[in-house]
Amino acid sequence: MAEVDALGEFKHGVALLNNGNPDLALPCLWRAFECERLNPSYLSFLGLSIARAQREWDQAARLCEMALQINRNEAVFYLNLAEVYASSGSRAKALKTLDAGLEKFGDDDRLRGARRKVEKRRSPFIPLLSRNHFLNRKLGKWLHKVSKRKRKNKT
């Protein structure tokens, strides 16, 4: 019986969160979490709600990180943790989290979109030309590949 109530509270909390009401979502998600403290979905969305409603970045990040440690097979857990990191100003951690998600799930549109929102765009390779000019696009992609390869070799 507690599971059904927890699931109902969770679904209601997520709906409130998605509708831009983190303050109202927080008690629902908290009640779901109290029923099942190791449920990664409850942990992740409670963390996201705490971040949005209370701006308690450390607590929110810990909850989202725990969810991801328990279950790495849900793209939404990467998205929630990345949002918490980005909101707290930890852009590098957010990008690292999204990259890990993209590596695990391939070309997931939600992860790609979140990464685009978080990343800072570099200035065009040739500033005199527009960002959409074919030379800037080709050289930018080449530079990105080279820098990605260098980062991979460092680790």
Identify the role of each PLM range:
Residues 11-18, 27-76:
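Alpha-helical adaptor scaffolds
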Residues 67-92:
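Mid-chain, well-packed structural core segment of small domains
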Residues 10-11, 41-45, 76-80, 96, ...:
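Alpha-solenoid helical repeat scaffolds
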Residues 47-48, 64, 99-101, 115-117:
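Short, structured secondary-structure boundary patches
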Residues 19-28, 53-66, 88-100, 125-129:
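Structural signature of tandem alpha-helical TPR/SEL1-like repeats
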Residues 1-11, 15-18, 69, 103, ...:
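Intrinsically disordered, low-complexity, charge-biased linker/tail regions
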Residues 30, 48, 82-83, 98-102:
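Amphipathic alpha-helical segments within well-ordered protein domains
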